[in-house]
Amino acid sequence: MGKSTLFNCLSNAKAQAANFPFCTIEPNVGVITVPDERLTKLAEIVHPGRIVPATCEIVDIAGLVKGASKGEGLGNKFLGNIRETDAIIHVLRCFDDDNIVREGGAVVNPVEDKEVIDTELQLKDLETVESQLQKQSKIAAIGNNKDAKVAVSVLEAYKEVLEKGQNARCVEFESKEEQHYAHDLFLLTAKPVLYVCNVDEASAKSGNKYSEQIAEIAKSEGAEMLVIAAKTEEDIASLETYEDKQMFLEELGLEEGGVNRLIKKAYNLLNLQTFITAGEMEVKAWTYYKGWKAPQCAGVIHTDFEKGFIRAEVIKYDDYMQYGSEAAVREAGKLSIEGKEYVVQDGDIMHFRFNV
């Protein structure tokens, strides 16, 4: 409850928001900007023509109901939409309101709501795993097919946890072959998840008894969790000026809006980081996966940059702020020249040298 309201705040879209299960039938897709004050501060020094923040795509998918794995409530369609995403943001109702309908009963119960979704996703994954296991077992039995044996090993591990009512993300594989096959299965419960506890305004800062229940579960699962008041975020989004929004947040005792916190959490959930390019034309944030090396990041800008990579000139963001210009950073000896093995760090200001 509250996911379409949150989606509207995140994307400035206007998806229909209401208190019944199938308010959203077709998925609404929005592009959200990742808040990053480093870009603004760099722009104050560089004075670029424009600032280009990093973006993520967010999809508002209809709420699932019990029986979705068997196609009930348009379940097959909704589960197919989830399969196409990289991560799941699970919005849970954590507030009392007699005027808002709850599927399956009147009492607010976010734990039960979570378990309903988990069960439907697990059942769908189990269906996928059993189908593939039957197929791969036959191939493995015919001859010495190494790929099929890897597949069987992965599928049996998944089958064991899913039958216990656990999620596929509980399973970790050591070999690259197993990891690759597991990834290509696109299991629903293998996706990273962020639980968003939608609370009332009075609980926006510290949460409540309902969000505390979800916090315990999230901790046991090693999952991320966030407390947010969707209706309050909607009110904040309707304010015209930055000053008005900050004043509203201060009155609630919050340093940062829930929408910004949610976007940052989602970005981290996907294991994403940002490197920056800064010049007269633009200051731009580029998204890459944590652990990527310089040539891979160069390829984010253009494939030719990766193919013909020579070296990367790197300035740490804090050094740029301290010295006030690229020239001053160079003069202070704080600009480093990095090769192909350099692991790019979040906030690095990069300039790539390449030859094609």
Regions found by a protein language model. Give the residues of each.
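Short amphipathic alpha-helical segments
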Residues: 18-19, 100-105, 207-209, 239
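Hydrophobic faces of stable alpha-helices that mediate helix-helix packing
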Residues: 82, 126, 130-133, 152, ...
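C-terminal-of-GTPase-core extension/linker across diverse P-loop GTPases
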Residues: 1, 7, 135-343, 350-356
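Flexible beta-alpha connector loops of hexameric P-loop NTPases
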Residues: 64-70, 106-108, 115-121, 140-146, ...
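Short, exposed interaction patches on small structured surface elements
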Residues: 25, 92-128, 219-237
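Conserved G1/Walker A P-loop phosphate-binding module
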Residues: 1-102, 111, 118, 130, ...
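Alpha-helical initiation/capping and key positions within long helical/coiled-coil segments
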Residues: 24, 77, 121, 128, ...
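Short, flexible surface segments
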Residues: 84, 345-346
